[in-house]
From Swiss-Prot:
Family: Belongs to the UPF0398 family.
Name of the molecule in the record: UPF0398 protein BALH_1408
Pfam families per the UniProt record, alphabetical: YpsA (PF06908)
Disulfide bond residue pairs: none
Species name: Bacillus thuringiensis (strain Al Hakam)
Top-level lineage group: Bacteria
Length: 184
């Protein structure tokens, strides 16, 4: 596996409204574990669409991993131009920082937002251009990642395409592990 697409929930879907929420570090730790293992097995590129939440947290994790594995690259392929246009200023600044550190940035449709079709095109692009999908996703709470997860599963039925998931139970295990370590 050379290229993995990473996605997951938007912050509000997780009840997270600030990047210093303790849940963010838990999610980043889970992403770090998975991505580091994939890098050790030959992963070269992580691709995201730049949406707030799991995708931008994954970008931060990639930057951390690059210290030890400088050959790992991050690409941000936005579904449309200026997707951050309606965001709050602090979210725009955070997003622009991520873009400034990414190894490659491009827009899939190369147009500003026109219709939901652009999100469908984004999902198709990500599944076509990657060897696997890593999603912070639980079928009990479908949310925004539902459509790309369905597309990945469909591709996996006909081709050698893998979907990897970080479930809520995985995040709970990390929380309990942290509590156990802090109690010692």
């Amino acid at each position: 596996m050379k290229v993995i697409a990473v996605t997951g929930y938007k912050p509000f879907e997780l009840g997270i409204f600030k990047n210093d929420h303790p849940g963010v570090e838990c999610i980043k730790k889970a992403l770090r574990r998975k991505l580091t293992a994939f890098v050790e097995d030959g992963l070269e590129w992580v691709i995201i669409s730049g949406q707030l939440g799991v995708e931008l947290w994954a970008a931060e994790v990639v930057f951390e991993i690059q210290v030890e594995y400088p050959d790992l690259k991050l690409a941000v392929f936005t579904p449309f131009l200026e997707q951050e246009e309606g965001w709050k200023e602090d979210n725009r600044e955070y997003y622009e920082f991520i873009l400034s550190q990414a190894d490659h940035v491009d827009s899939i449709t190369k147009r500003k937002y026109e219709s939901p079709e652009q999100f469908k095109l984004k999902n198709q692009f990500f599944i076509e251009k990657s060897d696997a999908l890593l999603a912070v996703y639980d079928e009990e709470k479908p949310g925004s990642p539902k459509y790309i997860v369905e597309a990945a599963k469909k591709k996996g039925e006909i081709e050698n395409y893998h979907s990897y998931f970080i479930l809520f139970s995985d995040l709970q295990d990390i929380i309990e592990e942290e509590q156990w370590n802090n109690a010692e």
